[in-house]
């Protein structure tokens, strides 16, 4: 079963459908694996650049899930026994 969130009902919007068709023509039906294994696609880098521009910062990094963000960031940020991270 395939599923996705559709909060804004964009899955059937004509512009979204056309962009999906074009992306499928260009990139195929999937990346083949997660970014950590298959590497970054130009779409990843473009999305991160757009987020950075929107936030007015030099760069950004998009994680695919909260868990991967925690695994990637917490060991970098937390160095001492006195540090505490609370994550939902």
Q: Residue locations for each model-derived region?
A:
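Fold-independent oxyanion-binding glycine-rich loops
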Residues: 4-5, 65-66, 88
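Conserved PLP-anchoring active-site segment centered on the Schiff-base-forming lysine
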Residues: 74-88
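Residue-level signal for short amphipathic helical patches enriched in basic/charged
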Residues: 11, 58, 80
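Short, flexible micro-motifs
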Residues: 6-7, 12, 31-35, 42, ...
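Conserved N-terminal alpha-helix of the aminotransferase class I/II PLP-enzyme fold
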Residues: 18-65
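N-terminal "arm"/small-domain region of PLP-dependent enzymes with the aminotransferase-like
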Residues: 1-27
């Amino acid at each position: 079963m395939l599923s996705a969130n559709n909060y804004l009902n964009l899955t059937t919007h004509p512009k979204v459908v056309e962009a999906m068709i074009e992306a499928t023509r260009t990139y195929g039906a999937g990346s083949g694996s997660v970014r950590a294994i298959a590497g970054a696609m130009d779409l990843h880098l473009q999305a991160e650049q757009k987020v950075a521009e929107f936030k007015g910062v030099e760069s950004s990094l998009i994680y695919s899930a909260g868990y991967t963000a925690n695994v990637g960031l917490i060991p970098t940020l937390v160095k001492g026994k006195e540090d505490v991270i609370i994550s939902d």
